[in-house]
């Protein structure tokens, strides 16, 4: 049987007989002696096969090739001084092989090199198609090991220090669509009826609070049928938590200690506490985003009142229609950003327009401190307005001022996107920085112009601020999101626990009494049986691991992810099923393949 893992061996084991299992990372023949790097999930160790010492093992080593699965028995020896490898944890030792047994060979050409010694860049589609090979590589091995350490740190903190208990909630549940589309599962036993895969354990964890389990957590699988991007997956993992009898401040404090524990345990990083806070209004005003990246400046400045009566209709018209005019100041932007990049066809212009802006206006601050204006802005900006713009933006000579004008939503989205683009483009972001913050005081609801109704900004179970109960359409929510380097890693709230308030919220978002009863009657009924005050939070575990590993894509934090087309390239899921299977489920497909036009 195995005595050690490859990556465990150190100088202390010199003279020890060992049995190792693993994969051939690479094989080298040097002057009649064969060297093999043997790899398992803990690392690699060098195997030596010398024909003068062990002819049999040498003969076996001659037949080894990359990725063969082998069992090796031998003795640990110290490396000669000239062969020490300080880059490897096992670099002080090597194993003189007495016996090599090939457990399995590679019978096809490898689609890419797996060896840790090979830094080959491999196309992502190929990596996902042969994911079992990709997971053998150092990068993905490290990522999944770190993911395991994160989960272990979470469990130890919540259970050992905070008395949480882990409870599993159903995966087959009821469809209550309020956000993304549900993944639906037909019931064979109950024809014509459907389960839904949970978008979160939200309702069940609230019911656990009603049940008296006052500190619950779960590493939960969740499912959302939504458009994908680099940091989203159709199935994902949450750290889900719920607590009774705690205030918002107490929940935030507990979660700061949890996050600090994770970073200390997994990365050895001491996080300063308390984390900074911004209200939703402050975040949107200063950054145009409710998940701002605060590793760099470039804060937005609202000048709507300054240009409201300006003759330039793009600005004044935006303000009169209820929108905004904001400036994104770029220090030293005159030297670093040309006009071509801001005008149609330029990369900065493209960033703004792809976020919905019609374009970008701009002015430059000359070296003498005066504003250099162009076109319609030049003809319509008074000296007083110029002076006020300089005062508010605190623009120094050489500063470029980019304007966004239009609806508040479009201005915020477009300038936020330009800000993020320039933060990277101008090298303003410290890649080692970890900027955590809370965003609080979100609106309870937002207006959906297409459907002509209010929608819950988070979800309809979020408790309104007690001071704002008179009008829920303008109420602040007792909600809190935690943001790391511009990405939301978690979000939560205090929950409604009184039936009358919950029914008012349902009414505010356009649910009739009958609809609310049909969808959430079981929850409303539970509120009649002594529901405690409670609140919670959920973290995107995949996204948190992505940030901790420094990866750009959430797919590199997951063992077997889907593509951005929601496909598994390894198993070729989703796939057709037989007519017999559909018939058993009383399901018929109405989908028809598109008709190809003839040439």
From Swiss-Prot:
It catalyses: tRNA(Asx) + L-aspartate + ATP = L-aspartyl-tRNA(Asx) + AMP + diphosphate. It is an enzyme of class 6 (ligase). Keywords: Aminoacyl-tRNA synthetase, ATP-binding, Cytoplasm, Ligase, Nucleotide-binding, Protein biosynthesis. One of its GO terms (biological process) is aspartyl-tRNA aminoacylation. Its EC number is 6.1.1.23. One of its GO terms (cellular component) is cytoplasm. Its main location: cytoplasm. The record marks 30 as: Important for tRNA non-discrimination. GO terms for molecular function: aspartate-tRNA ligase activity; aspartate-tRNA(Asn) ligase activity; ATP binding; nucleic acid binding. ATP binds at residues 224-226, 233, 488, 540-543. Pfam families: GAD, tRNA-synt_2, tRNA_anti-codon. SUPFAM superfamilies: Class II aaRS and biotin synthetases (SSF55681), GAD domain-like (SSF55261), Nucleic acid-binding proteins (SSF50249). Homodimer. Aspartyl-tRNA synthetase with relaxed tRNA specificity since it is able to aspartylate not only its cognate tRNA(Asp) but also tRNA(Asn). Reaction proceeds in two steps: L-aspartate is first activated by ATP to form Asp-AMP and then transferred to the acceptor end of tRNA(Asp/Asn). This is Aspartate--tRNA(Asp/Asn) ligase. It comes from Synechococcus elongatus (strain ATCC 33912 / PCC 7942 / FACHB-805) (Anacystis nidulans R2).
